[in-house]
């Protein structure tokens, strides 16, 4: 079972990496998010491949895909859908919005208002939408890939803590190195994106997600996760530590990373390598530190420093 899963995962990684040139670790994190039934927040400067990654992942799966461009005038109904009165039947009929897709690209999510941002909360957490006293289930698998520009860019609204906590991982792509950028200039990534065909079906994705949940986690590693999140709650550098949801996210992501590496069990390195992308966006840095440095980078550094102080299980 695990070897068959590994073959499917390798196929998916290879397909996506063709479009996102020179960023295999970023691709791996995106696949980890998918396997862990999580959502991905991709933050970076414009033009480094955030949207390309989302498109490549969606095109690699034989599932429905919708892109939502978040703007200042976007309304919750533009995302969730609306109930329309049918004159023939005398009843209201629900018309689903673009959120009712397997893979949803929420492009530049921090360019819309907090009210519209918060309309995603129920969908991301419970895989359902409640409107007009009715509950509508979302398709499975369901994954939101949200992109955002750094907050110093004009016209952005910071995501509230409740929204950030719904994202399994937050990643940055970064600039390509010289050789990879030359390949991009030659059109390598764009050509590959156009040619991408689905390599996994919806059933194969949900099977992989079920297999991920069966990856074994020793008791000592549960204690390790608890020690890490506990350290964030006690740190004098932070005003808000990691929630139980964050601890669960780190555990699920670690199980997915183990499966991606071809293992049926989690090792401490899985947890260590995912602690920053799984936890840093969930903490709040004290205001005096935010003034001294960018709060996002500072949060990464604080979580990493706390990690170094915690004994690793043997």
What do these predicted ranges mean?
Residues 86-91, 112-116, 124-215, 255-257:
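Canonical AAA+ ATPase core
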Residues 4-48:
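Pre-Walker A (pre-P-loop) alpha-helix and adjacent loop at the N terminus of AAA/AAA+ ATPase modules
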Residues 60-88:
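AAA+/P-loop NTPase substrate/partner-engagement loops
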Residues 29-32, 85-105, 134:
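Conserved alpha-helical scaffold flanking the Walker A/P-loop in AAA+ ATPase domains
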Residues 2-3, 234-314:
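C-terminal engagement/docking regions of AAA+ P-loop ATPases
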Residues 45, 79, 147:
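P-loop (Walker A) phosphate-binding loop of NTP-binding proteins
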Residues 31-71:
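Walker A/P-loop
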Residues 44, 107-108, 119:
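Walker B catalytic acidic pair
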């Amino acid at each position: 079972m695990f070897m068959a899963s590994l073959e499917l995962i390798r196929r998916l990684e290879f397909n996506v990496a063709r479009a996102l040139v020179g960023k295999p670790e970023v691709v791996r994190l995106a696949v980890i998010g998918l396997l862990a039934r999580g959502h991905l927040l991709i933050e970076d400067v414009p033009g480094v491949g955030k949207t390309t990654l989302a498109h490549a992942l969606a095109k690699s799966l034989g599932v429905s895909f919708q892109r939502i461009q978040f703007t200042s005038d976007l309304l919750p109904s533009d995302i969730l859908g609306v109930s329309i009165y049918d004159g023939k039947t005398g009843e209201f009929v629900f018309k689903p919005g673009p959120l009712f897709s397997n893979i949803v690209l929420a492009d530049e999510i921090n360019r819309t208002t907090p009210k519209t941002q918060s309309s995603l909360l129920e969908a991301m957490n419970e895989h359902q939408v409640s409107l007009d006293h009715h509950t509508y289930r979302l398709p499975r698998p369901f994954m939101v890939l949200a992109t955002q520009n750094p907050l110093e860019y004009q016209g952005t609204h910071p995501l509230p803590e409740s929204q950030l906590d719904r994202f399994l991982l937050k990643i940055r792509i970064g600039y390509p190195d010289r050789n990879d950028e030359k390949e991009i200039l030659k059109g390598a990534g764009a050509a590959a994106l156009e040619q991408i065909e689905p390599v996994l079906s919806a059933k194969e994705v949900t099977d992989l997600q079920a297999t991920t949940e069966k990856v074994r986690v020793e008791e000592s590693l549960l204690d390790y996760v608890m020690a890490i999140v506990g350290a964030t709650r006690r740190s004098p550098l932070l005003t808000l530590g990691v929630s139980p949801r964050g601890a669960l996210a780190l555990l699920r992501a670690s199980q997915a990373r183990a499966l991606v590496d071809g293992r049926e069990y989690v090792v401490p390195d899985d947890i260590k390598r995912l602690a920053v992308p799984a936890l840093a966006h969930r903490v709040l840095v004290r205001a005096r530190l935010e003034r001294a440095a960018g709060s996002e980078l500072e949060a990464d550094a604080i979580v990493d420093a706390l990690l170094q102080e915690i004994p690793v299980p043997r």
